């Protein structure tokens, strides 16, 4: 019987162990998509206690707590941090079989070095005091943890109207050598159907100093913000797409009419929503190309399912799930519309429903080219798929329908400074899979060849892709 989470956790073959320990383990982290608050990095936040750094804003843990019957008061309510922490300690033993059980223990091991005890009610008080003592030390500040985890770059997620003042402050601080770059997230622009669209355009108009009455005005305002983001080191644009829409792009006069209808709070037809969305996204893609940005699309979530809890807690509180809309055809047409004018940027496609894995893995092959290795990527297992089975499925289907060797690898997609252990989790799973191929005679026993492939997937490919 293997010991729980020893140094060879998830590694069952000699080849897998060599690949992980000699090639994957010590590669830096290039975390090209996350939801960290840049203010916490700029101000080098020192966390008061383990609950603050561990449970604050972590909707994965919140969902588990609710499922275990923990009252909301002990999750997002006014209970003390220690009370919330004890509720988590009681819940974790119930999570065996869920990736949260693995993540929780990995997060205690790195960066805290707790390897000799399980997280449960019996050990909770000891772990609380031990970790809290460390959290008061400079090396366990927000920046200290990033350095301890060997992070080289993080890409945050930022609205076009964000000031990016904290990114600028980090950039100007020569004492900190980790790149923290903004990523453009224009969801509130291309989703004209959102109730807050008109209010958002007022904000965009103010920050860009452009009156927005026409489609040309909107592009002018966005162009000023694109240039500002680019000057702040932006490398990527991300798009949350619950629905993938496509329609032939009409004349600009039609787009002006659609925009005017929306500004006057008149209802739009679905076709008009699709025309507007397609026009904005195709135009944005051309602007990304000019700036050599990567375009990311996160496809297929159903958000804010629980309207009662949404009214109480707002978005990103643990009430989202996997959607089942089909979108192969509109996605194909959208990418093709971008590509027709040779204006399709480097692109990463993520699907939330694993049913769509093969579709996405085959779709990316349609638009490769321009002498760019892995120009179009099938993104790592996302959200409900960033667990062992989900990662394995994504890796296997990418390897079978694309080139795994060109994959840009893992990202945290997280709000937590403790989530860098997800890169370790991914690397162990990757090495186990490739090591298994060798042991079964399905790949050559060429450690030098495979080791380079591992290093590329873990770090080098992403570094080169997001230049």
Curated annotation (Swiss-Prot):
GO terms for biological process: D-galacturonate catabolic process; D-glucuronate catabolic process. Signal peptide: none annotated. Its EC number is 5.3.1.12. One of its GO terms (molecular function) is glucuronate isomerase activity. The keyword Isomerase applies. Keywords: Isomerase. The keyword Protease does not apply. Pathway: Carbohydrate metabolism; pentose and glucuronate interconversion. It catalyses: D-glucuronate = D-fructuronate; aldehydo-D-galacturonate = keto-D-tagaturonate. SUPFAM superfamilies: Metallo-dependent hydrolases. It is an enzyme of class 5 (isomerase). Belongs to the metallo-dependent hydrolases superfamily. Uronate isomerase family. This is Uronate isomerase. The gene is uxaC.
